[in-house]
Each structure stands twice: as structure tokens, then as C-alpha cells.
């Protein structure tokens, strides 16, 4: 297949991030300069974001059989780039106190972002697998970046071994699907899997194994066991990337697969997904109740949020509102998670050993960092789905599509899960306003709001509030991604 200039324009974000990887690699080889390499990474990610405007002008097109660039791909590419940009921004002050090599951190984040962009554009099971591996392999190193801390090293080893096992399930599942259908393209799968073929045992086994592999990457029950330990052990900026860019990119490609290939038409697969969604919502929220570590709490919380999103995915066959629900929910989840993990990153910067992730570290934060406490409160309220926040809009959409698809027991699970979640989110928020302990623990720098990370956190809080009151602009952007499918 010939690559035309139009194709190159469509691939601009991928090409720009790839070029940034090469430039940063050469810069590290030439001379180690933390500020220079951080700046190059941020410039590259910003340039990739700006290039989305030119991609939009080029229109929807297939670029090789592996990728399709359209409104859907642009939306998820934008979300991945925003998460990657925030990760680099939070990482800079954290790395200032880190005595080992700092520069490779940005290189690994950029390579993982490259995998996320590939997933957003994937239109083939081969590009899906390549994208997942490209996003996973750098994360093995990022999770263990604070390798002198036993907890970080343990988390990295655990994530590496379990991720390798999940990838083998995913790859074997793809092989079974190919053996039955004769093609790996999403569109071809949609054409070849009609007339009751989805009930073939070999095909069901293949999709079942793919669900195991993808369920691990998305931290869905019962493939979630790595999540709390890895979130806790990873440096705070890495937990930010794990919770946002990684999950958004993988969920986006799963959604595209469901749109083109009628996987959800199989009653057996729908039942399995419904059980996974129900278990993820209830178990994730129940396990978060007893947590006193904020990163572990947010890890269990992410399990329940992916369960909510799975409800919209199961309801996908009932209409376009499910696509809208996923887009709005993921945007709300992105900004809320960036704000929450951003506060943890600011409190943990510069690197001084373990992160400030104990709930005790945030007790009475309001009395000496009032704006930071207010930001954390807004994020907790949004994650809980309280009205006047973007999290509420996303959760309302999920409930609406659940009702529309008559998924009554899953709607009930969303309501019960949200009620349980309200308790532990408010527990974090209330602790911020209690009397500060006599011997205060870690604290954010006094001028945190003037740092790049502080600005990102403040913008995230502002977006959560503004889009929670007036979500029409976000809904319009999400709808623009839909007609180009």
C-alpha cells in the first residue's frame, strides 16, 4: 500500500511523538540535562496535540490495513496526549530529588504514549496487540523507577510477570479467532462473524481468552489483583499514567472492536461481561472502603470506574448514546484522576523515598495548603459523581444507557456502588479539613500553585467544575467523533 501525503498528515501525532522519542534519545546520549529533556518531551507532546487540528482537516481515512484515523481516533489520541503531558509535568519536580538517572523517565513515557496513540487508531488485531505491548513494556520500567524502594521494585516485578501472562492469553485468543474467521481486521471480523458464527466453540474460546488479556490491562475483576499493589508501589506520576492514559487507550480500542465486530451480539459473551462489570463495581468499591493509603484507594476506585464503563459497552448495541456516554465518562475520569494523582505527586515532590500516599499525610491539609485541599475535594466529589461536577454527568450518562438497554441489575449495581463510593471519597475529603496533627508529615512546596504541575492540577479542577455545570461543549466534541465512525 502506498503512503500518500494525506496519510502522513493523518499520522501526524504518531510521527511527532515518534520523532520526539528519537530527539530525546539523542539528547540523552549527547549530554544529560534534566531540564532540556523534560522541555523537549513537553514540546513534542504539545506539538502532537496541536497537530490534531490538521488531522481533522484531512478527514477520516484508512492508513494501511492496520489503522483508521477518524473522529473517534482523534478523541482518544487527544485524551492519551493530555494524560502523557500531565505525567511529564508532574514528574519534573518529583525527579528533582531523584539521585539516579532522571532523563529515561521521559523517554519511557513518550514510548508508552506512542503505544496509546497506536491503540486509538487501531483497526486490526495486530495493531491492537502491538499498541498494548508498546504501552505495557515502558510501564515495567516506569513502575520500578524508584527501584531503591522495595515496594516499587516488587510492584514492577509483579506487574511484569502478570502482564506477560495476560499478553499470552490475548495472543492465543487472537490466534483462535483468526483460525475461525480467517482475518484479523475489525471490519472483516464484522463481515465474517455473521449468521450465528459467534456461537462457534472455537470463536467463543478465542474471545474468552481475549477478555482475560484485556480484562487484566483494564483492572477488571477477577483480573485486578495487581492493581492496588502496583498503584501503591509505582511513583505517583507513574500511577497517574497507569490510571489514565493506559486505561483510556485500551478501553478505546476495545470499544472500536465492539463497534465493528459484533462481539456483543453473542449472549454468552454479554453474560460474561455483565458478570465482570457487576463484580468490578461492587468489589472495587467494597475493597476501597478499608484503605488508608490514597493510591491503593484510587486503585480500587479505578476498578469500579472501569466496571461502570463496561455497562455502557454492554449497552453499545442499543444506540449511539452508549458511545457518547463512554466519551463523556472517560473525559470526566481523566480530569478527576489527573487532579487527584496530581495532588499526591505535588505532596510527594521532590523525591524523598516513599510517596506521601498515607491518608494521615493529608489530615488538616486545608489549614496550611487551602487551595490544594480545595482541589482534592473537588476531585473526590467528581469521582463520587456528585452533581455540579463532570463525574456526575458521566455517571448520569451510564445510568441512562443502562436503563435504555434494560440492564436493570447492572443499573442497580451502579447505584449501590456509587453509594458505597460516596463514603470513602467523602472520608478523604473530610480528613483534609480536620485539625492538623502536632507532627505534620510530608507537605507540598509553598509555591506549588506557580509550578507547571500546580497549574495542571488547577486547570483540571476548573474543567471538572465548569464542564460539570455546562457540559454541552464536551458533549459536542464527543458527538463530533461519532459520525466519522
UniProtKB/Swiss-Prot annotation:
The keyword Transport is assigned to this record: yes
GO biological process, one term: ATP synthesis coupled electron transport
Catalytic activity as recorded in UniProt: a quinone + NADH + 5 H(+)(in) = a quinol + NAD(+) + 4 H(+)(out)
Annotated keywords: Cell inner membrane, Cell membrane, Membrane, NAD, Quinone, Translocase, Transmembrane, Transmembrane helix, Transport, Ubiquinone
InterPro entries: NADH-Q_OxRdtase_suN/2, ND/Mrp_TM
GO molecular function: NADH dehydrogenase (ubiquinone) activity; NADH:ubiquinone reductase (non-electrogenic) activity; quinone binding
Cellular compartment(s): Cell inner membrane
EC number per UniProt: 7.1.1.-
Topology in membrane: Multi-pass membrane protein
Cystine connections: none
Signal peptide annotation: none
Top class in the EC scheme: translocase
Segments passing through the bilayer: 8-28, 35-55, 71-91, 105-125, 127-147, 159-179, 203-223, 235-255, 271-291, 297-317, 326-346, 373-393, 408-430, 450-470
One CC-aspect GO term: plasma membrane
Job description of the protein: NDH-1 shuttles electrons from NADH, via FMN and iron-sulfur (Fe-S) centers, to quinones in the respiratory chain. The immediate electron acceptor for the enzyme in this species is believed to be ubiquinone. Couples the redox reaction to proton translocation (for every two electrons transferred, four hydrogen ions are translocated across the cytoplasmic membrane), and thus conserves the redox energy in a proton gradient.
Cited HAMAP family: NDH1_NuoN_1
Family membership: Belongs to the complex I subunit 2 family.
Subunit description: NDH-1 is composed of 13 different subunits. Subunits NuoA, H, J, K, L, M, N constitute the membrane sector of the complex.
Record protein name field: NADH-quinone oxidoreductase subunit N
Organism from which the protein derives: Shigella boydii serotype 4 (strain Sb227)
Lineage, opening ranks: Bacteria, Pseudomonadati, Pseudomonadota, Gammaproteobacteria, Enterobacterales
Gene (name only): nuoN
Amino acid at each position: 500500500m502506498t503512503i500518500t501525503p494525506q496519510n502522513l498528515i493523518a499520522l501526524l501525532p504518531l510521527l511527532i511523538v515518534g520523532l520526539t522519542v528519537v530527539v530525546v534519545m539523542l539528547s540523552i546520549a549527547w549530554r544529560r540535562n534534566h531540564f532540556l529533556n523534560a522541555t523537549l518531551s513537553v514540546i513534542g507532546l504539545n506539538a502532537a496535540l496541536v497537530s490534531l487540528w490538521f488531522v481533522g482537516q484531512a478527514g477520516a481515512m484508512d492508513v494501511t490495513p492496520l489503522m483508521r484515523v477518524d473522529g473517534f481516533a482523534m478523541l482518544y489520541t487527544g485524551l492519551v496526549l493530555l494524560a502523557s503531558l500531565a505525567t511529564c509535568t508532574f514528574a519534573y519536580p518529583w525527579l528533582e530529588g531523584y539521585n539516579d538517572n532522571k532523563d529515561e523517565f521521559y523517554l519511557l513515557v513518550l514510548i508508552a504514549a506512542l503505544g496509546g496513540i497506536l491503540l486509538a487508531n487501531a483497526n486490526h488485531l495486530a495493531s491492537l496487540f502491538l499498541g498494548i505491548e508498546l504501552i505495557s513494556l515502558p510501564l515495567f520500567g516506569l513502575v520500578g523507577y524508584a527501584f531503591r524502594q522495595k515496594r516499587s521494585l516488587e510492584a514492577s516485578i509483579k506487574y511484569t510477570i502478570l502482564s506477560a501472562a495476560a499478553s499470552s492469553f490475548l495472543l492465543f485468543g487472537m490466534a483462535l479467532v483468526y483460525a475461525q474467521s480467517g482475518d484479523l481486521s475489525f471490519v472483516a471480523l464484522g463481515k465474517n462473524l455473521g449468521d450465528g458464527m459467534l456461537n462457534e466453540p472455537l470463536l467463543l474460546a478465542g474471545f474468552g481468552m481475549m477478555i482475560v488479556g484485556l480484562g487484566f490491562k483494564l483492572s477488571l475483576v477477577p483480573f485486578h489483583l495487581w492493581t492496588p499493589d502496583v498503584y501503591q508501589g509505582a511513583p505517583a506520576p507513574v500511577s497517574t499514567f497507569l490510571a489514565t492514559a493506559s486505561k483510556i487507550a485500551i478501553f478505546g480500542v476495545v470499544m472500536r472492536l465492539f463497534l465493528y465486530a459484533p462481539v456483543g451480539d453473542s449472549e454468552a459473551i454479554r453474560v460474561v461481561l455483565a458478570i465482570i462489570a457487576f463484580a468490578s463495581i461492587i468489589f472495587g468499591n467494597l475493597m476501597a472502603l478499608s484503605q488508608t493509603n490514597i493510591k491503593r484507594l484510587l486503585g480500587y476506585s479505578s476498578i469500579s470506574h472501569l466496571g461502570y464503563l463496561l455497562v455502557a459497552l454492554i449497552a453499545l448495541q442499543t444506540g449511539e448514546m452508549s458511545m457518547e456516554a463512554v466519551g463523556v465518562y472517560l473525559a470526566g475520569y481523566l480530569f478527576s484522576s489527573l487532579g487527584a494523582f496530581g495532588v499526591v505527586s505535588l505532596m510527594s515532590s521532590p523525591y524523598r523515598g516513599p510517596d506521601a500516599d498515607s491518608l494521615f499525610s493529608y489530615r488538616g491539609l486545608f489549614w496550611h495548603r487551602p487551595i490544594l485541599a480545595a482541589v482534592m475535594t473537588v476531585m473526590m466529589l467528581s469521582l463520587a459523581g456528585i452533581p455540579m461536577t463532570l463525574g456526575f454527568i458521566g455517571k448520569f450518562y451510564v445510568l441512562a444507557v443502562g436503563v435504555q438497554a434494560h440492564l436493570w441489575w447492572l443499573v442497580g449495581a451502579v447505584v449501590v456502588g456509587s453509594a458505597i463510593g460516596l463514603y470513602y471519597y467523602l472520608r478523604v475529603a473530610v480528613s483534609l479539613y480536620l485539625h492538623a496533627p502536632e507532627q505534620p508529615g510530608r507537605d507540598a512546596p509553598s509555591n506549588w500553585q506557580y509550578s507547571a504541575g500546580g497549574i495542571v492540577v488547577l486547570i483540571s479542577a476548573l474543567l471538572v467544575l465548569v464542564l460539570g455545570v455546562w457540559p454541552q461543549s464536551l458533549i459536542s466534541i464527543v458527538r463530533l467523533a461519532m459520525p466519522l465512525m
